[in-house]
Amino acid sequence: MFPGMFMRKPDKAEALKQLRTHVALFGSWVVIIRAAPYVLSYFSDSKDELKIDF
């Protein structure tokens, strides 16, 4: 059938190591995406603020 169905499961230590790596990568991407607007606004020349009037 499908060859992936019969593969061995990785041991717990290897799975935890991979999970830590993936969580660290995800966290770093979140930090980069959250910090990007602040960094871009710091380096932009225009000092205009966005004002929304209701």
Swiss-Prot record:
<keyword id="KW-0472">Membrane</keyword>
<comment type="function">
    <text>A component of the complex responsible for the recognition and translocation of cytosolically synthesized mitochondrial preproteins.</text>
</comment>
<keyword id="KW-0812">Transmembrane</keyword>
<dbReference type="InterPro" id="IPR034554">
    <property type="entry name" value="TOM6_plants"/>
</dbReference>
<keyword id="KW-0496">Mitochondrion</keyword>
<feature type="transmembrane region" description="Helical">
    <location>
        <begin position="21"/>
        <end position="43"/>
    </location>
</feature>
<keyword id="KW-1000">Mitochondrion outer membrane</keyword>
<keyword id="KW-0007">Acetylation</keyword>
<feature type="modified residue" description="N-acetylmethionine">
    <location>
        <position position="1"/>
    </location>
</feature>
<dbReference type="GO" id="GO:0015031">
    <property type="term" value="P:protein transport"/>
</dbReference>
<dbReference type="GO" id="GO:0005739">
    <property type="term" value="C:mitochondrion"/>
</dbReference>
<keyword id="KW-0813">Transport</keyword>
<comment type="similarity">
    <text>Belongs to the Tom6 family.</text>
</comment>
<dbReference type="GO" id="GO:0005742">
    <property type="term" value="C:mitochondrial outer membrane translocase complex"/>
</dbReference>
<protein>
    <recommendedName>
        <fullName>Mitochondrial import receptor subunit TOM6 homolog</fullName>
    </recommendedName>
</protein>
<comment type="subunit">
    <text>Forms part of the receptor complex that consists of at least 6 different proteins (TOM5, TOM6, TOM7, TOM20, TOM22/TOM9 and TOM40).</text>
</comment>
<keyword id="KW-0653">Protein transport</keyword>
<keyword id="KW-1133">Transmembrane helix</keyword>
